[in-house]
Amino acid sequence: MLPVHTEVKPNPLQDANLCSRVFFWWLNPLFKTGHKRRLEEDDMFSVLPEDRSKHLGEELQRYWDKELLRAKKDSRKPSLTKAIIKCYWKSYLILGIFTLIEEGTRVVQPLFLGKIIEYFEKYDPDDSVALHTAYGYAAVLSMCTLILAILHHLYFYHVQCAGMRLRVAMCHMIYRKALRLSNSAMGKTTTGQIVNLLSNDVNKFDQVTIFLHFLWAGPLQAIAVTVLLWVEIGISCLAGLAVLVILLPLQSCIGKLFSSLRSKTAAFTDARIRTMNEVITGMRIIKMYAWEKSFADLIANLRKKEISKILGSSYLRGMNMASFFIANKVILFVTFTSYVLLGNEITASHVFVAMTLYGAVRLTVTLFFPSAIERGSEAIVSIRRIKNFLLLDELPQRKAHVPSDGKAIVHVQDFTAFWDKALDSPTLQGLSFIARPGELLAVVGPVGAGKSSLLSAVLGELPPASGLVSVHGRIAYVSQQPWVFSGTVRSNILFGKKYEKERYEKVIKACALKKDLQLLEDGDLTVIGDRGATLSGGQKARVNLARAVYQDADIYLLDDPLSAVDAEVGKHLFQLCICQALHEKITILVTHQLQYLKAASHILILKDGEMVQKGTYTEFLKSGVDFGSLLKKENEEAEPSTAPGTPTLRKRTFSEASIWSQQSSRPSLKDGAPEGQDAENTQAVQPEESRSEGRIGFKAYKNYFSAGASWFFIIFLVLLNMVGQVFYVLQDWWLSHWANKQGALNNTRNANGNITETLDLSWYLGIYAGLTAVTVLFGIARSLLVFYILVNASQTLHNRMFESILKAPVLFFDRNPIGRILNRFSKDIGHMDDLLPLTFLDFIQTLLLVVSVIAVAAAVIPWILIPLVPLSVVFLVLRRYFLETSRDVKRLESTTRSPVFSHLSSSLQGLWTIRAYKAEERCQELFDAHQDLHSEAWFLFLTTSRWFAVRLDAICAIFVIVVAFGSLVLAKTLNAGQVGLALSYALTLMGMFQWSVRQSAEVENMMISVERVIEYTDLEKEAPWECKKRPPPGWPHEGVIVFDNVNFTYSLDGPLVLKHLTALIKSREKVGIVGRTGAGKSSLISALFRLSEPEGKIWIDKILTTEIGLHDLRKKMSIIPQEPVLFTGTMRKNLDPFNEHTDEELWRALEEVQLKEAIEDLPGKMDTELAESGSNFSVGQRQLVCLARAILKNNRILIIDEATANVDPRTDELIQQKIREKFAQCTVLTIAHRLNTIIDSDKIMVLDSGRLKEYDEPYVLLQNPESLFYKMVQQLGKGEAAALTETAKQVYFRRNYPDITFTSPAVMNTSNGQPSALTIFETAL
C-alpha cells in the first residue's frame, strides 16, 4: 500500500529562531501562498518527529501496558488516567510557568491603573513630579499589556499541541486494539461505537488540556486578588468574594449535571450513528423494499431522544455563559453597596481598581476554572469509554509456525468450541482432521452447519474450548462475503506485496479477471468505490481470490468463493485456480457446488457443528448406497414434512462473514502499486470530497437561522441583545458618575469647610440596583434564547439532510464512501449540536462588549477616534489576509479527517482477512499515515490561529498605550471617573478583542459544517415516491412485464449496462436470467425498480412504470436480494416495519421458511433485538428471512437476485420449493449462477454485455448446440449436463403436452452408469 501522500515539505518550525517562534513569523510564507491561491495538501508541512502517530501511540501504549501489569499485581482495576498522567505530566507541568507569570501580571496591572486614576483625583497642573511619575505608571501598564499579549498565545499554542498529542496517541491505541479484538469482544461493541470513540470522544482531549492548569491557578489568583482588594477597599471586598464563592459550587454542580447529560447524549448519538450506518449501507435494499418511511421514523425517534438531552445540556451551558458575563456586575454591586452602607465614600480609583481586579479574577474563576471542571468531567467520561474498549478481550497472538522440514500442515484433533459460552450447544464439536500440502479438503453441509466456523477455528478466530488446532505455514483466507477496500483493483490484489508483472498476470488469468479488467475504464488501476461499488458481486469474489493466490501462502482457506460466480467462471476458477495454481498447497474449500467434490482429496460433511462423515469421493460411492433413488424419494417426501436439513439459528455471537459485512465506511486509501513502479503508479481517482471555496455565503447563515426560528423571533433576539448591552454599560457609567459627583462634593466641602452637604444615597443605590437587575435578566434571557434557536436549527437541518439522503438516487451511495456520508451525520451534526451554538453565543457577547468599549472610550476622549481609524484598517486587512489561509486550512482539516474513519471501518470489515494475512502492522502504518496527514492540517490550524491572535493583541496593546498616554496629555479636560472608565474598558479589550475576532473566524469555520449539511439537503432527488397518477388498488393483477427497447445506465456519463432490451414476460411466467458476471442481470432488476431512470419503456399490466410513484411501483414487487440485509432492531421490525401483519401471519411466514424453531429459541422470540446487521444469523439464514419478507408481501411479481448463491443445496431446494408453492400464481424472475435452480423455468433469458442474446424455453435452447445456454450447461460436466437436460425435457413435455404421460429414467450419468455428483451430499445427511 502506498504512502498517503508523497511530497512532504519540511517543517519550518524546526529551524525557526526564538523571535520567530514567539511571533510565529515562520508561518509568513504559508500566508503568502494562501493569499495567492487555494492551499492544497502539498502545501502542508510535515508533522514534527515528536508528533508522529507511531511515536506517540507506542509511547502511551507502553505506559498503559505497565499500568495493566501493575493493576494485575495489585488486584485492582487498571486506570487509563494514571497511564496518561505518567506519560505526560512532566511536559505538561512545565507549561504551568506560563500560566503563573501571565496570571501574576494580570493581578498587578490594576494597581498601576489605580495610580494613574489617583493622579487625576489629586490633579495639580503645576506638579511636574506627579506627572512624570504618572508617565512611569503608564509605561509599566503598557509593558504589562505587551507581556500578556505574548505569553497568552505561547501558552495556548503549547497546551493545544499537548492535547493534539494525547488525541493522536489515543487514536493509535484504539485502532491497534480494534485490530486485535476477539470475536466475543466484537459482540460487545459495534463499528458505530468505535467510530464515535474516534470522532467524538478523543476530541475532548484537545479541549481539556487548555484549561487544566486553571484548576490551581484559579484559587491562587483569587487569594492574591483578595489581599489586594482588602488593602484597597477593606472588609467590603469580602461581600464580593462571597458571591464568587457561591458561584463556584453552583458551577461545579452545573458541570456534574452537564457531564451526566453528555454521557446520556453520547449513548443516543452512538445509537443514531450506528443506525445511520446501517441505513446508508443497506440503502439499495431499503429503496427496493420502499422502507424509507419506516427508517425515517426510526431515525427521527432516535434523534428526538438525543436532541432533548442536547437541549438540556445546552441550557446548562447557556447559564454558565451568562454567569460569566453577569458575575462581574453582581460582584461589583454587592461590594460597593456594602462599602457605601458601611459609611465609606466612593472614589474613582477605588471603583476602577476593584472593577479591574474583579475582572482579572472573574475571567479565571468564572470562565477558565468552570471550563476546566466541565472539560475535565467530559474527558473523564471519554476516558472511561475508551478504557472499557481497551479492556475488551483480545485474540491470542498466533505466530505462523513453519516447521523445521519446511512442510506445512493443518492438524485438528477433538476440537470443540463455542462462539457464545452462554449457549449450551457448541458451534463445533469433536472435529478431527489432518490436511497436508497438495491436498484439497472440501467441507460441505447445510446452512448453519459450522462450515465458516471451521475455517475460523483454523484461522485462530474461534478459540478452542477443548482439543487442539495446530497450523504450520502461512495462511491466505478468502471470506464468504468478499472484502475490498477503496483503492485500485491492483492494490486490492497486491495487498502490500511487491508488484511482479509475470506472477501478477498469471494470477489474473487463473482468477478469470482478464476480461473484466479489460472492460473497466482504467483496467486494474480503476479505483474501487466504497464497499466495491464499481464491481459486481462475482468480480469482488474473484478479486478476493486473486489477493489470496498472489500472496503465495502455504495454506488456503476458501469460504465458498464459487457461489458468487456463474457456472462457466466457477468451472474456470476451480480448474485453473484451485486445482492448478494451488495444487501444491493445502486448500480447505467450503462449498455448496457438489459437482466439484470429485476433485477433492477428502470430503468433510458437517451438520449442526459435528462431523457426520469424512472420506474420499470414491469411499462415499463404494458405500453402496443407491444415491439416485434415495435422492428422488427424499425430494418427493420432503414436501409435507420438515426437511432434515432444517437450518437452526447458528449458535454463536458473531462470524466474520456477517459481523462487519454490512458495516460502516470503507476507506479512501490512496494506494496503488508499490514504490519504484512508476508506470504502475498512475491510477484513476475516486471522486474527491467537494470542498467549497471562498467565503461562507450569506445564504448559509440565512438557511441556518431560518431553520431555527421564524424571522420575527430572530429580530426579537437581535433587539434583546442590543438593549441588554446598553444596560450593561449604563451600570458601569452610573458608578463612574456617582464617584465623580462624590469627588466634586468632597472638593466643594474642602473648599468651603461645609461638612453637612451629602449625596442622596437611596437615589444612587436605587438606580444602581435597578440597572444591575435588568442586566442580569437580559443576560440570562439572551443566552437561553440563542441556544434554543441554534439547537433547533441543528435538529431541523439534520432532518432535512436525512430526508434528502433517503430521496437521493442509488448512484449517490455508489459514488460517495460511507465514511464521507457518515462524517456529515456524526462530525458535522456534532459540531452544530454542541460547539457552534456555544461559539456563536460567545461571539455575540464578546462582539457587543468590544463595540461598547470603543463607544465608551470615544465618548470620553473623542480624539481617540483618530488612531482608531488606522488601527481598524490594519485589523480589517489582517483579518481578510488571515481568513484567506485559515478557511483552506480548516477545510483541509475536515477532508483529511474522513480517511481516518474510512480506514478504521474498512479494517473492521476485513478484520479476519487482515489477521489471516498478518497485515495488522501494515494497516497500522497506514492508519498512522492517515493520522499524520490529519495532524499536519491540525497543526497548521492551531498555529495559524495563534499567528493571527498575537497580531490582534498587538493592535489592542497599541490602543491601550494610546488611551493611557493620551489621557495624561489631556489631563486638564478630563475627570478621574472618565479616565477610569475609558482605561478599565480598554484593558478588558486586551484578550476580549482578539477572542471576539477569533470567535468570528471560528463561527465562520464551523459554518463549514452547516454548509456541508445544507449541501446534502439539496441533493439530486430520484422521482417522487407518490404521484397524482396512482395505479388501481389491485394492481398488478396479472404480473405481465413488457420491456420495450430499454437502455439503462447508472449515471448520465456512465456506460450503457443494458442495450436495446425488448422482451415480454407473461402473467405467472417463471423466467430464469443467466449470463456471465457483469452481463447486466442485476442491472435488469435495477431498471425494473427504477434505481436509476431507464430509457425506453417498461410496462407492468399495461401501466408505464415511469408514470407512477416509486413507492407505488416498488411496494408491488417483492425481491430476495443478492446480499441479504438485516437491520439492528427486532425480528418483527425486520419482517414487518410498518406493522401491517398480525403475529400469526409473521409466525406462519417464519414456519414456511423453517426459521420458526430458531426464532422461538431466542430469549425474546420475535422481539429479541438482533445484533448489528443481524450478524448473529448465518448468511443462509438471513436469506431465508428475506424469503419470509417476500411471502408476507404476497405480491404478483417476485424477483430473486442470486438469492441461493450462499446456501447449501438442501436450503436451496427448500427455497425453490417454497417459491414454487407460494408463488405459483406470480410472475417470478430469477437471476441464478446455479443452473439447476432455473432449469425448470418457463423461459430462460440469456444476457451478454447488456444485450438480450437468447430468450426461450430451456429445453428449446438446449436443443441448439450453438446457443450460449447450451454451452453454459455443458461446462458443468457430462453428468450434471445430462441431469439438467433431462429435467428441462420433463418440464417442457409436461407444459406443452400435458396429455402425454412422460416417464424418464433415474437421473443418471449414463456415460458411466453413476449417479450425478449432485446427489452425494443429500444422502450423506
Swiss-Prot record:
Cofactor: Mg(2+)
Location of Phosphoserine modifications: 664, 668
The UniProt record lists the keyword Transmembrane: yes
Keywords: ATP-binding, Cell membrane, Lipid transport, Membrane, Nucleotide-binding, Phosphoprotein, Translocase, Transmembrane, Transmembrane helix, Transport
SUPFAM superfamilies membership: ABC transporter transmembrane region (SSF90123), P-loop containing nucleoside triphosphate hydrolases (SSF52540)
E.C. designation(s): 7.6.2.-, 7.6.2.2, 7.6.2.3
Described function: ATP-dependent transporter of the ATP-binding cassette (ABC) family that actively extrudes physiological compounds and xenobiotics from cells. Transports a range of endogenous molecules that have a key role in cellular communication and signaling, including cyclic nucleotides such as cyclic AMP (cAMP) and cyclic GMP (cGMP), bile acids, steroid conjugates, urate, and prostaglandins. Also mediates the ATP-dependent efflux of glutathione conjugates such as leukotriene C4 (LTC4) and leukotriene B4 (LTB4).
Protein's UniProt name: ATP-binding cassette sub-family C member 4
Gene it is expressed from: Abcc4
